[in-house]
């Protein structure tokens, strides 16, 4: 692994596997793991749906940015970010500058199927009010250029977790 790498950020849409891959990658590297959504819910004292309903999206995004800054201040950490972390320019800049950022890219159909199978993901507030597959397609179309701007590497997120971890580990060796 490149000697300057001390943080890995995982970005991508909802249900792209950021937390699952992040935990496995952190274990492989012997590093800590941080999840910005978990940091936000811990600080807010409620789940994200409640936070957004009571305080609004701007308050959530502010707390999300704070969580990213806190995670970026740590060393030897793999950070799973919320799907909308890239919406703010300052977050994209921090992701580029503070470590190696990997975009877990998935086909819309795979994300929609994961969301349909996992009730926990269904607890997140809808961004558009549309059907899951339509919302995923719209959100990914909007965010794809932002993920590309923030990421140093793109990895297919629909492979087995162990394969994704191997792919990222190999990329880190050259970062």
Swiss-Prot record:
GO terms under cellular component: cytosol
Uppermost EC category: transferase
GO molecular function, one term: shikimate kinase activity
Positions contributing to ATP binding: 12-19
EC number: 2.7.1.71
GO BP terms in the entry: amino acid biosynthetic process; aromatic amino acid family biosynthetic process; chorismate biosynthetic process
CDD domains: SK
Main location: cytoplasm
Reactions it catalyzes: shikimate + ATP = 3-phosphoshikimate + ADP + H(+)
Signal peptide positions on this chain: none
Keyword vocabulary terms for this entry: Amino-acid biosynthesis, Aromatic amino acid biosynthesis, ATP-binding, Cytoplasm, Kinase, Nucleotide-binding, Transferase
Pathway in which this enzyme or protein is active: Metabolic intermediate biosynthesis; chorismate biosynthesis; chorismate from D-erythrose 4-phosphate and phosphoenolpyruvate: step 5/7
Cell location: Cytoplasm
The keyword Zinc is annotated on this UniProt entry: no
Annotated family: Belongs to the shikimate kinase family.
PANTHER family reported in the protein's UniProt record: SHIKIMATE KINASE, SHIKIMATE KINASE 2
The protein's name in its UniProt record: Shikimate kinase
Origin species: Nitratidesulfovibrio vulgaris (strain ATCC 29579 / DSM 644 / CCUG 34227 / NCIMB 8303 / VKM B-1760 / Hildenborough) (Desulfovibrio vulgaris)
Underlying gene: aroK
């Amino acid at each position: 692994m490149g000697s300057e790498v001390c943080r890995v950020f995982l970005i991508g849409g909802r249900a792209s596997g950021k937390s699952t891959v992040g935990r496995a990658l952190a274990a492989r590297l012997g590093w800590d793991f941080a999840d910005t959504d978990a940091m936000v819910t811990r600080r807010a004292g409620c789940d994200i749906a409640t936070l957004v309903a009571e305080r609004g999206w701007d308050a959530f995004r502010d707390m999300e940015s704070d969580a990213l800054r806190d995670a970026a201040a740590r060393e030897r950490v793999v950070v799973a970010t919320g799907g909308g972390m890239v919406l703010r320019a300052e977050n994209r800049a921090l992701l580029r500058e503070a470590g190696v950022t990997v975009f877990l890219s998935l086909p819309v159909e795979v994300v929609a199927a994961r969301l349909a199978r996992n009730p926990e993901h269904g607890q997140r507030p809808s961004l558009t009010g549309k059907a899951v597959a339509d919302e995923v397609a719209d959100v990914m179309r909007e965010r794809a250029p932002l993920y590309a701007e923030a990421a140093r590497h793109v990895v297919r997120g629909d492979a087995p977790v162990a394969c994704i971890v191997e792919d990222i580990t190999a990329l880190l060796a050259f970062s």
